[in-house]
Amino acid sequence: VIGRGECADPQECKTIADLGVDILAAGIGNIHGVYPANWEGLSFETLAAVKEAVGDMPLVLHGGTGIPDDQITKAISLGVAKINVNTECQLVFAEATRKYIEEGKDLKGKGFDPRKLLLPGYEAILAKVEEKMNLFGSVGKA
C-alpha cells in the first residue's frame, strides 16, 4: 500500500454504529503493516468527524505499528480506545530470534531447544507490549 491510506465516511460510520456494534474501526489514513516513506500521517479531521458521528462508541485504530507516538496519543485523546500493533510485535520477535541465531547461541549446549531459541523473541514481545501499554495509558486498566 502506498500513499496515505483510506479515510472513512463519517456518515457511513454512523450507519454502522447505529446497528448496535460495540466498537468501530474506521479508516483515518492508517495502513496495515509497515508504513511507506511517503505516508502523510493520520487524518485527525476524519477521526474527529467520525467520533462526532458515532458519539461514545469506542474506536479502533488498525495498523498502529509505525505511527509516531504523538499521533497515537492524539488519536487516543479523540476517542481511539484500542490500537493494533501486531506487526510491531512480529518485527521485534523476528529481530530478537534472528540475533540469537546469528550469535550462534542455537549451536551452544541445548540452545536449539525451542524453549530457549524462541525465548528472546517472546521477551522482546513482552517488552514491546509493556512499552505500548505505557504509551496508550492502559497500564492498570482492565
Question: Which residues does each predicted region cover?
Answer:
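Alpha/beta enzyme core
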Residues: 1-57, 69-85, 91-98, 103, ...
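Structural detector of well-ordered beta-strand residues that form the stable sheet scaffold
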Residues: 60-62
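Flexible, glycine/charged-enriched surface loops at secondary-structure junctions
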Residues: 106-119, 138-142
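Short, hydrophobic-biased amphipathic alpha-helical segments
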Residues: 114-117, 121-135
